[in-house]
């Protein structure tokens, strides 16, 4: 962000909290377009073509578009006439794409500046390690063995567009930018809020709506974190008055004053050091060592907060209480639970010896094979029963491109599921992808699988599907046996910043 500070003229705009003038800068559109391309190439998606690739716009189109934005009458276009009207040979969806992409870049500027200023004076921050999704699991391994219950929360999405705009009012003081955002949302877009959470293809600009959704979630989390720090055990009698005050004041800064000054006597201040909160996308988990009664109170609090403060109707089944020793937790593409490992210790005192049976809790992660087969079947790599099939959509590509696609998917899944305690399901997924690749190549050459393998050899694909065990043997050449033992355990990588579509099965 510092290298673009002068280029974006942020100092002059930040003095008055004005972001709206940046919409009329040509280089902002170039930055937004380049960022969309980088995200699409880095995510490793299967067949999802981002909107940045759909609409190729040049600098000439950007200049004409900015010129027409100065003319307010030409900017206002009815959504009902979007199919009939054309803009210099392009569909009006290009308008929506350009505005949404630019606003996503501009809206993130205040938060990026806050992050840069907060990191000053703290030394070099290794943020690339903290960005990895796998960095969560070592934390879960260390903490979950001491916890009992988990609240599995499915965060509801806002039912009205104005809710998202009102949330940004607390952080962005530029009224013109908020009016432009409201104008685009109401006039141009018919958004499916469920697709907002699952990132379906129907979203015109996922980055913008993920930013809006995260802003909405951040507001409710700010209230939750304050209450969690002030009081972990809320009495049931305080919920009614508490939510009335939340509804009355509305803003978080007013909430803090009210809670500290007026409600200190009715909050039961009992700290719970074993409470942990984790969120990713539209799901969050609240793990604690509390009793089922207290976990039910937190469940009631979540539902009441969404309904009374955010006007979101949330059913109680969206918040489920799970016991770690009995139930599996579906989070980040893994089935996680606590497994008891029996341990027998022989103790001898003088002439007497006796055995001591101990049960050690161990954090266990498994691959959800049934949802994974469903994702592979949806992507047409296999049928509903898990039998591999050919990929007709890729049969027209070159052999090297077909193999490269399958290899990339296979390695990404193997890389992500390296933390599984049992690799049997991972081998099954690799088998499906490997045989699907062979069937796709055989379909292209109009032959059977057996005939194709006889012609190219049975070891044709072995060099492309490098096992993680072979990679570890290259890293630890002097301790190959130790690397094999390491491979059987959990391996968490610190370079995974996004989830493949196949893993994100919903």
UniProtKB/Swiss-Prot annotation:
GO molecular function, one term: RNA binding
Superkingdom assignment: Eukaryota
Primary subcellular site in the record, as a coarse category: plastid
Signal sequence segment: none
A GO CC annotation given for this chain: chloroplast
Pfam family, one: Intron_maturas2
One annotated GO biological process: RNA splicing
Keyword Chloroplast: yes
Coiled-coil region list: none
Entry keywords, A to Z: Chloroplast, mRNA processing, Plastid, RNA-binding, tRNA processing
UniProt subcellular location: Plastid, Chloroplast
Annotated function: Usually encoded in the trnK tRNA gene intron. Probably assists in splicing its own and other chloroplast group II introns.
Family: Belongs to the intron maturase 2 family. MatK subfamily.
Full protein name: Maturase K
Naturally occurring in which organism (per UniProt): Carica papaya (Papaya)
Classification of source organism: Eukaryota, Viridiplantae, Streptophyta, Embryophyta, Tracheophyta
